[in-house]
Amino acid sequence: MSIDFDKYTEFVDAVTSDSSKDFVSLADRLGDLDRQGANIERLTTAAIGIAAEGGEFAEIVKKMVFQGKPWNEDNREHLIIELGDVMWYVAQACMALDVPFDDVIRGNVKKLEKRYPGGSFLSLIHI
């Protein structure tokens, strides 16, 4: 199969939002979100940080699984450190959304109860 990369990039550009391609449009969109009450600065920090730090965590696992890096205390500690970095950005997201971390976990438990109706998560929640 032959792909015309010029047509492909034209298509990508055609379906990409103006705020993804143009600084003024992006600034306008950020202003709109700010006026709507979004803590967009902190939310953006959280989104990019969670993705980046999650990638660092995944990189360590990838090297252990596919590149022969050993499972040892150093790598375990490195994973814990990276997981802590992920949690730092999760805290940023909680602040951006004005939601306590406990409420996020409670919401996840409720979602899991619906997904796995045979399971019991009540012991996880202290009332």
Positions of PLM-derived features:
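Extended low-complexity intrinsically disordered regions
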Residues: 1-65
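A short structural micro-motif
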Residues: 111-114
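Conserved small/polar residues in nucleotide/adenosyl-binding loops
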Residues: 125-127
